[in-house]
Amino acid sequence: MRVRFTPSGRRRFLDIVAYILRDNPAAARRFKQRAQTVLRRLERFPESGRVLPEFPDLPYREVVVPPYRFFYRVAGKTVWVVAVWHGAQIPQEPRLGG
């Protein structure tokens, strides 16, 4: 199983890292490392994230790297990270193509 970002998911992740980096480079590195560790775990356990409570009928799951939520979908042998949202935000319905 491979973990990949959709273009919009990658853009959002990089924007978050850049935002944190402006004020606290060490925190940005820690966040990026924690995210990589959590996402790497999905390679072996793709169903380990919880179903999105806001969209229980959709085929999306999430893993949390506080305070951010990584939304993903398993398609074949790939885990697609489709969105990254701050936990305080109300998410929009994720889309695979993003």
List each model region and its residues.
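Basic, Lys/Arg-enriched alpha-helical interface segments
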Residues: 2-60, 78, 92, 96-98
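Enriched for short, Lys/Arg-rich terminal
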Residues: 65-98
